Amino acid sequence: GWPAYPGSNGIRSSVCQKKLGCGSKNLASLGVCKAFCLGRKRFWQKCGKNGSSGKGSRICNPVLAHAVEKAGKGLIKVTDMAVAAIVKYAGKK
C-alpha cells in the first residue's frame, strides 16, 4: 500500500533536512541532502496523501513512494561514505 503521508509540515524541506541531520556530520552531504528533501517535497506535493492528486502521473506509485521515504534514511550514510572515499582518493594525488 501507500506509505503514511508525512503531513504538510512533514514534507517541508527544512523539516526533512533537520530529521536527516543534513550536514551535521559532514558538510559535503548538505547539498545532496537539500536536493533530496526538495525532491521529496515536490513528490508529496504532486502525489498527495495516496497518489490521488497526481492522477495519471507515473511517479505517483506506491513503490516509488516507499523508496522516497526509505531513501532519506540511507541517503546520509551513503553520501558520507562517498564523501569519505572522494577525500581519500583526492589525498592520493
UniProtKB/Swiss-Prot annotation:
Disulfide cross-links: 16-37, 22-33, 47-60
Keyword Cytoplasm part of the UniProt annotation: no
Cellular location(s): Secreted
Entry's Gene Ontology cellular component terms: extracellular region
Organ and tissue specificity: Localized within the skin and proboscis and are most readily isolated from body mucus secretions.
GO molecular function annotation: toxin activity
Ranges that cross the membrane: none
Assigned keywords, A-Z: Cytolysis, Disulfide bond, Hemolysis, Secreted, Toxin
GO BP annotations, alphabetical order: killing of cells of another organism
Family designation: Belongs to the worm cytolysin family.
Function description: Cytolysin that shows hemolytic activity (on bovine erythrocytes, HC(50)=5.75 mg/ml). This hemolytic activity is completely inhibited by small unilamelar vesicles composed of PC/PG, PC/PI and PC/PS in 1:1 molar ratios (with at least 100 mg/ml concentration).
Protein's name in the database: Parbolysin P5
Organism ancestry: Eukaryota, Metazoa, Spiralia, Lophotrochozoa, Nemertea
